[in-house]
From Swiss-Prot:
One Pfam family matching this protein: SPT2_N
Protein name, UniProt field: Protein SPT2 homolog
Source organism: Danio rerio (Zebrafish)
Comp. bias regions, Polar residues: 111-123, 278-297, 305-327, 335-345, 353-364, 387-398, 437-450, 462-490
InterPro entries reported in the protein's UniProt record: Chromatin_SPT2, SPT2_N
Location of region: Important for interaction with histones: 523-629
Superkingdom as given in the UniProt entry: Eukaryota
Record note on domains: The acidic C-terminal domain mediates interaction with histone H3/H4 complexes.
Cell compartments where the protein resides: Nucleus, Nucleolus
Main location: nucleus
Length: 629
């Protein structure tokens, strides 16, 4: 189509639209970006490849540098660790090359060192490094350390597995000559192989110990002491119970001879076990009329015995004797084997005191056969009653024969725990009236040995005496240590339950070998002595359920708190800045002072209540007066 034809068509169409269109606002089709020619894709690929290679080289160099550093570091670290472990386990390290020089495996090692050894052996195989030797390097362990697990050079896999299986063994002993041949690259490969193999590690839990307060330190000391004593008691009682038959028989014979011989001269030996009891028992004696005998219906109290308490065993065999004495018969005595002679026996010891006292009052009138140990029937039918028989006064606190002493010679009896005994002579013709002042043989150092007046021991023998008593029933006589016990000062502890007063204390009966035997009278059975009667130590920080919801204001400002304290109590903290907390811990008031304070505050509270009531009454009166107006 040429230009003329176009013009002619245009002229024809000219009249179709009065307004000719000059410009159009329509956007045309988008233009395609023309490709820039001459770009070589192979060149681009080569460039990218070059960059990747460079980066890889750089990474390898970094890795190598890092590995060198790590190798040096591991070497230093393991050397330090090995030295630390060597000093701890006393292994034979002569200079450190990574392997302890041990020619043959040692004998069984302690548990602690075996766990250390196990940890060190397992960490070689890519295990955890956080054992107790790692404490001073943990700050630097930021990077991953694949080369770490490669401490012992040239140890082959079978040796490794062997060591992991036999964990308690020491590092296996044969000298390894090939240790230097394995280079670092081989070690790295070995480590890479091993790093995914599972290693069983027993985690040793370390309980963090916090600093203790003064009270806690004291408590721990007490507990330790008590545990030691308990251990000692168990060992001693085991030994002694093995020897009890032979010892009791041999010991009671010389004892009898001593008493008989000295009874004629009018002076009486005091075997060593009585020596510290003289003061307490000499206060006890008060002669009783024959009407105040134990009732024949006395209950036997042997069932309370337990194997650990030799006092209880003693009372059990005592009950058999006691029953026959009560019924005034003369059956055969139990053989000596039934009476244990452990050092903790309180009853035999006390028996000797009453035996000598009784003999002193009748001046050897007792038949010598009466004190012979292995004898058959008691040679006592001449008198209506057994010749050595002790009763205790009606007002006396009851004792608990079944649990008279804890095992071990160091156990002091609880208050009310030891029977208070008043010996009298069994021969009715020679028996004095209760009011009479028959002088028992006065022991040197004892506070009051005369048997006159109604003085009675209301508490048991204090524990300090029994602690120092020698063991064994038949020791030779020795000097008496004078030691008086004031019964007035012994007050019950605040938390202690009072023992119910019984009708009468247990009667004591002199056994065939001169040992005293306790017989429980009729009446309600006493509750067993529990640990609440004898607290090992006062600890004021024990758990208290009422303190569960105690408000702890640790978050608050200390100055704010001390300001309130100053307002309430008038105590200014700033005045006492030099006082250490440790010193303040020991400035605690005694129980007596606390009781005084309690009483004072109670009085103040009562006064305040009265004041308040008075105020309320006045207020009511005023209101009533207003209403009336």
């Amino acid at each position: 189509m040429d230009f003329d034809s176009v013009l002619s068509i245009a002229s024809q169409n000219q009249g179709l639209s009065s307004l000719p269109k000059r410009y159009s606002l329509k956007t045309g089709p988008p233009k395609k970006d023309l490709k820039v020619g001459g770009v070589n894709s192979a060149a681009v690929q080569a460039f990218l490849k070059k960059k990747a290679v460079e980066q890889k080289n750089k990474e390898q160099q970094d890795k190598k540098a890092k590995e060198d550093l790590l190798a040096k570091r591991v070497e230093l670290k393991s050397d330090r660790k090995a030295r630390a472990m060597a000093s701890r386990t006393k292994d034979n390290f002569r200079g450190y090359n990574g392997i302890p020089v041990i020619d043959q495996p040692k004998k069984r090692q302690s548990k602690g060192s075996s766990t250390e050894e196990q940890q060190s052996s397992t960490k070689y195989e890519g295990g955890d490094y956080d054992d107790e030797d790692n404490f001073d390097y943990e700050g630097t362990d930021s990077e991953s350390e694949p080369s770490r697990p490669v401490k012992p050079q040239a140890i082959s896999r079978p040796e490794y597995s062997n060591r992991v299986e036999n964990k308690p063994k020491k590092l296996s002993a044969p000298a390894r000559p090939a240790s230097s041949s394995m280079n670092f690259a081989d070690l790295l490969k070995l480590a890479e192989k091993k790093q995914f193999e599972p290693v069983e590690l027993k985690v040793v839990k370390k309980t963090e110990e916090r600093l203790r307060t003064a009270e806690e330190i004291r408590e721990l000391e007490m507990e330790r002491r008590v545990k030691k004593l308990d251990k000692g008691k168990d060992v001693r009682s085991d030994k002694n119970s093995g020897q009890k038959d032979s010892r009791s028989q041999t010991s009671s014979n010389p004892q009898k001879k001593h008493v008989d011989r000295d009874g004629k001269n009018g002076r009486f030996p005091r075997p060593s076990e009585e020596k510290h009891q003289s003061s307490s028992t000499s206060k006890k004696p008060k002669l009783q009329a024959s009407s105040e005998r134990t009732p024949t219906s006395a209950k036997l109290h042997g069932d309370r015995s337990n194997s650990g308490s030799s006092g209880a065993l003693n009372s059990k065999s005592a009950m058999k004797n006691g029953a026959s004495f009560q019924a005034k018969q003369a059956p055969p005595r139990p053989s000596q084997g039934q009476r244990p002679a452990t050092p903790s026996d309180l009853t035999p010891r006390k028996g000797n005191v009453s035996l000598t006292q009784a003999k002193s009052s009748i001046s050897g009138s007792c038949p010598p056969g009466a004190a012979r140990p292995g004898q058959g029937p008691h040679k006592n039918s001449a008198h209506g009653r057994p010749s050595n028989f002790s009763t205790s006064g009606p007002s006396q606190k009851p004792a608990n024969p079944g649990k008279l002493s804890r095992p071990g010679s160091n156990a002091p009896p609880r208050p009310g725990g030891s029977g208070v005994v008043r010996p009298f002579t069994g021969d009715p013709s020679k028996q004095p009236r209760p009011g009479g002042n028959l002088q028992s043989q006065q022991f040197p150092g004892s506070s009051r040995a005369s048997l006159n007046g109604p003085k009675r021991m209301e508490r048991g023998v204090s524990g300090s005496q029994i602690n120092r008593m020698s063991s064994g029933p038949g020791r030779s006589q020795c000097t008496v240590v004078s030691e008086t016990i004031s019964t007035k000062n012994i007050t019950p502890r605040p938390g202690m339950v009072q023992r119910p007063p019984g009708p009468q204390g247990p009667r004591t009966v002199i056994g065939p070998s001169g040992h005293r035997i306790l017989v429980k009278p009729s009446g309600p059975a006493l509750p067993p002595i529990t640990s609440s009667y004898k607290r090992k130590f006062e600890d004021e920080e024990e758990y208290d359920s009422e303190m569960d919801d105690f408000i702890d204001d640790e978050g608050e400002d200390q100055d704010e708190i001390s300001k309130h304290i100053r307002e309430i109590f008038g105590y200014d903290k700033n005045k006492y800045k030099d006082e250490s907390d440790y010193a303040l811990k020991f400035m605690e008031s005694s129980w007596k002072e606390q009781q005084k304070e309690e009483a004072r505050s109670l009085r103040m509270a009562v006064l305040e209540d009265e004041e308040e009531e008075r105020r309320e009454l006045e207020e009511m009166q005023r209101k009533n007066a207003k209403k009336r107006k």
